[in-house]
Amino acid sequence: MNPNQKIITIGSISLGLVVFNILLHVVSIIITVLVLGKGGNNGVCNGTIVREYNETVRIEKVTQWHNTSVVEYLPYWNEGTYMNNTEAICDVKGFAPFSKDNGIRIGSRGHVFVIREPFVSCSPIECRTFFLTQGSLLNDKHSNGTVKDRSPFRTLMSVEVGQSPNVYQARFEAVAWSATACHDGKKWMTVGVTGPDSKAVAVIHYGGVPTDVINSWAGDILRTQESSCTCIQGDCYWVMTDGPANRQAQYRIYKAKQGRIVGQTDVNFNGGHIEECSCYPNDGKVECVCRDNWTGTNRPVLVISPDLSYRVGYLCAGLPSDTPRGEDAQFTGSCTSPMGNQGYGVKGFGFRQGTDVWMGRTISRTSRSGFEILRVKNGWTQTSKEQVRKQIVVDNLNWSGYSGSFTLPVELTGKDCLVPCFWVEMIRGKPEEKTIWTSSSSIVMCGVDYEVADWSWHDGAILPFDIDKM
């Protein structure tokens, strides 16, 4: 065989091997497609298949990577169904940590909003933290002067519970310097109050769209709860105040369906003062524990029926739960009248447990520092001083602030009762600390069947920030 013949032979063999290799690849691809097709994914690789089972309360999310399937069970909720929320509050022995956002610590180097008045509310599939921003970020020049309550820059925004109030995950809800929000099982409803003090307007959003408005009727800082409103079988209830903060004001209960007001009633409470109610559903009614900013160091109680009839009075317990307040030993308690003769106050909460009450309060009697929750035997119906349980959440060496209530719906927990939960705001900056700004973070606790040890889940940010040193 001469050299030319050798070259031709070697070339022919090489070409044959290349063709054979190509054929093997084609056959391999055909077999792979046929096998995956028979596996029930309609020939789609790297895809996501969502199978919905009406007979269960889940969605099965199957992500397929070639021949590997990852199954993730997602909560399922039919958006055509209202939440019931007529169940009783679960009887609990203590409160366990649910979430903590650490917003101010993160905000020293992250894009975190300057906020106040955070609160939590839940849908059938998630809980969200709502908060009133100041239209500025921590450690930025626009944070200067944010101790002010009402400005045109304040907005209601929300994140999933536990997330910091950061720029990247926050969702806009409403323009507001006072607000409430709740979910009826279908969509979120928010109420955001904004505008001048004498002519403020509350704009109701349902599913993110403005649906109704409430104009100030007394011309003196229309305001609302700063915590979750309450939805029962599709109807949502909340309380508003219009009038002075240090003497008799006017109070109204509102009822809305799909974001449109379907009823309202004035609350007759001469000699009493109601602000910033913390409300929750219990046995088919709305129970609210509020703030008396006029004279009382005991908290007003408002119980609302679906027909908007109501019962109003004060938390009976023989222990005061507002701040500032006097000594426990000197307080007698009353179910009908303000007691303690101390002006000012702070937003707080309580939960009825039969005839007992869980009541939260600052540990300090004079300032917003520390936080504890007490169970007082027969404290909902009698002027009892008997503490059967006490749990410390923030020690008295650290700042606290507002606190409020919400519940975990049965659709979320699978229980046959509503889990009581509360949040504690931890205010940092002005007026207590040497900064140019005021903001807060929060700790969230939920009721459990066990006693929980005392600890301090305080804010923990090291101040001042760089912006405060300029």
Which stretches of residues belong to each language-model region?
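Beta-rich carbohydrate-recognition and catalytic domains
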Residues: 44-226, 230-275, 280-341, 351-399, ...
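Short, low-complexity, Lys/Arg-enriched N-terminal segments of secretory-pathway carbohydrate enzymes
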Residues: 1-3
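A short, acidic, amphipathic alpha-helical segment used as a generic capping/interface helix at domain edges
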Residues: 343-344, 399-408
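Alpha-helical transmembrane segments in eukaryotic/viral proteins
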Residues: 8-41
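Solvent-exposed helix/loop surface patches that form functional interfaces
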Residues: 348
